[in-house]
From Swiss-Prot:
Anthranilate 1 binds at residues 81, 112. NCBIfam families: trpD. This is Anthranilate phosphoribosyltransferase. It comes from Persephonella marina (strain DSM 14350 / EX-H1). Mg(2+) 1 binds at residues 93, 227. It comes from the Bacteria. It is an enzyme of class 2 (transferase).
Length: 339
């Protein structure tokens, strides 16, 4: 059957929901050859994944995921993005997770090691001294007690082992970059989700709505960022239950002066680690902290703890400079030692 799906995809035809679910069951259960996996991933990429295809694949990912037994999901958010931006920024969404948690919002930070960037969220978490491969029960306890738990994708998506090597060998972004943020194992109902392509903003928002998200922002910085940008305009899709509104924002809308790309560039793991520590310790007074605060502002507004993004930015800066974000890191490090 997989050959029939490959033929259809390579002819530029969309798969139905049932076909896509069947195809992803085949991939996730290790029933496809390397050549077939490569053909499916590149074929879908060349064709362009439909909303129905993405949501069907995400449903299979969610079904097969190991669940995280968080006690209170009422205001649980994830800041996992697709990765693969074109600018090589530092780990904005990971630092943002600490800031959000520092203000008392519970975060289930889903992430992985780098696949298409220099330094993934799992890489930076590990460098910060956080144990990344906690059991589902330990991660749930970290979320409930500390306010932040890291959900290392391979622990929660064991079926992904059947495609991870092929993804790395292909070396380009595929549907799996999109599916990761759509498959939070803790069932977070709020999201700040950055995507690497402006053409994904509205489709991913529609997928989130289909998957039952309560409120989310799907964002793409127009210079190629999977974050809210402080250097140029950002395309935004705001998801509020079944309602979706798409619009553009610029840094000046929030009282933030535009930065240059050099102001927000990251580097290798050591370089990004130092940036993360400087921001979390409240030592950084550069545009990097503005960048994190802007993204945290959107996250705070998504979850409903502030009335506006601008108010969220102020809350983010207050959380950073009062060392509350760093306190979350210290608690997570301590918890990691006992975990």
């Amino acid at each position: 059957m997989i050959k029939e799906y490959i033929r259809k995809i390579t002819e530029g035809k969309d798969l139905s929901a049932d076909e896509m679910k069947d195809l992803f069951n085949i991939l996730m259960e290790g029933q496809a050859t390397d050549a077939q996996i490569g053909a499916v991933l590149i074929g879908l990429k060349m064709k362009g994944e439909s909303v129905e295809e993405i949501s069907s694949a995400a449903q299979i990912m969610r079904e097969k995921a190991v669940k995280v037994p968080v006690k209170d999901r009422s205001r649980l958010i994830d800041t996992c993005g697709t990765g693969g931006d074109k600018v090589d920024t530092f780990n904005v969404s990971t630092i943002t997770a600490f800031v959000i948690a520092g203000a008392g919002v519970k975060v289930a930070k889903h992430g992985n090691r780098s696949v298409s960037s220099k330094c993934g969220s799992a890489d930076i978490m590990e460098a910060l001294g956080v144990k990344i491969d906690l059991s589902p029960e330990q991660a749930a306890e970290a979320i409930d007690r500390i306010g932040l738990g890291f959900l290392f994708a391979p622990v929660y998506h064991p079926a992904m082992k059947n495609v991870i090597r092929q993804r790395r060998e292909i070396g380009v972004r595929t549907i799996f970059n999109i599916l990761g943020p759509l498959s939070n194992p803790a069932g977070a109902k709020y999201q700040l989700l950055g995507v690497y392509d402006k053409d994904l903003v509205e489709p991913v928002a529609r997928v989130l709505s289909l998957l039952g998200i309560e409120r989310a922002y799907v964002v793409h910085g127009m210079e190629g960022l999977d974050e809210v940008s402080i250097t140029t305009d950002t395309m935004v899709a705001e998801v509020d239950g079944g309602d979706i509104s798409v619009y553009s924002v610029k840094p000046e809308d929030f009282g933030i002066e535009r930065a240059s790309l050099d102001d927000i560039r990251g580097g290798d793991l050591d370089f990004n680690l130092q940036i993360a520590l400087d921001i979390l310790e409240g030592k950084d007074r550069s545009r990097k902290t503005d960048f994190v605060s802007l993204n945290a502002g959107f996250a705070f507004h998504a979850v409903g703890v502030v009335d506006s993004v601008k108010e969220g930015i102020e809350l983010a800066k207050e959380t950073i400079y009062s060392k509350k974000a760093y306190e979350i890191l210290e608690k997570l490090r301590e918890y990691s030692k006992g975990g």
